[in-house]
């Protein structure tokens, strides 16, 4: 069967980061697991739901380790590979690091899909890994009923320059680098109400690597107190995790949140995923969204795939950071401020 004749999204029930296990379910499971005591060299582990682990090698070098994979979110195999790779690599950038190696994680239904499809998926991933300056060094594959692909990525970072989601400080400005809405837009593709050509802005955004470190001077990099990437738990979920880890409250100017052109159209037409509901269940007790209309309430819970970075920046540097990032991240915007901890983790204005 010729690969161009197969719409990959029609071969799976859920696509992209919308296929994540619901956060409340995942937390309940993990609470029942006895993990060993953390090694003294482990700078960042899973306690604060950060984007990657950090393991200190010496005073100059630490390892950044992460893993991400999912089912197809688009119909084109090569584009799927690019997006899956960009999404996995993003976790390294969210910690302030640089990716150095990547290993593929592949499940593939050999009985129903042509080998040419996986060649294209792997080529897309390989191209994106090379763009990030890393090396594609191998991986593992299994014959499975559903196509799944992603990467295990290792990066390097100076231990003194690590970003985490636990250091946002009162007074900081919040910068978001990419627009929101990939969950509802790709749900439109899966429902065959949209074609890829209708949402090219979102597809290009998902395939773009979050290499903010390449666009900021050392002084501006040092002005970033905390960071996280916005993915499957939506803007609301990842903002809440950053606020909780940092013991602060985020005030979000919701009207400043960048969104893709057709995002509200898709939300109005109920192109939704299960993750819209589970993300709302996860965050609603901990956020104040009373001032938002129905569409914005859906948008903040929209599960992002390969979404942007949310950066907590020294206020004096936020405009300079924004100006530098807009060279590559054109939708980037200042979307809120950080305040001392209040009753709710995130307040949407």
Swiss-Prot record:
Reactions listed under catalytic activity: hydrogenselenide + ATP + H2O = selenophosphate + AMP + phosphate + 2 H(+)
GO molecular function annotations of the record: ATP binding; magnesium ion binding; selenide, water dikinase activity
Cofactor binding note of this UniProt entry: Binds 1 Mg(2+) ion per monomer.
Cofactor(s) of this protein: Mg(2+)
Enzyme active site: 17
GO CC entries: cytoplasm
EC number annotated for this UniProt entry: 2.7.9.3
Matches recorded under InterPro entries: PurM-like_C_dom (IPR010918), PurM-like_C_sf (IPR036676), PurM-like_N (IPR016188), PurM-like_N_sf (IPR036921), SelD_I (IPR023061), SPS/SelD (IPR004536)
Binding site for Mg(2+): 51, 91, 229
One Gene Ontology biological process: selenocysteine biosynthetic process
Entries under Pfam families matching the protein: AIRS, AIRS_C
Top EC class for this record: transferase
Annotated ATP binding sites: 20, 48-50, 68, 91, 139-141
Keywords, alphabetical: ATP-binding, Kinase, Magnesium, Metal-binding, Nucleotide-binding, Selenium, Transferase
Feature type site, description Important for catalytic activity: 20
Function: Synthesizes selenophosphate from selenide and ATP.
PANTHER family tied to this protein: INACTIVE SELENIDE, WATER DIKINASE-LIKE PROTEIN-RELATED, SELENIDE, WATER DIKINASE
Subunit field text: Homodimer.
Family affiliation: Belongs to the selenophosphate synthase 1 family. Class I subfamily.
Protein name as annotated: Selenide, water dikinase
Protein species of origin: Nitrosomonas eutropha (strain DSM 101675 / C91 / Nm57)
Recorded name of the encoding gene: selD
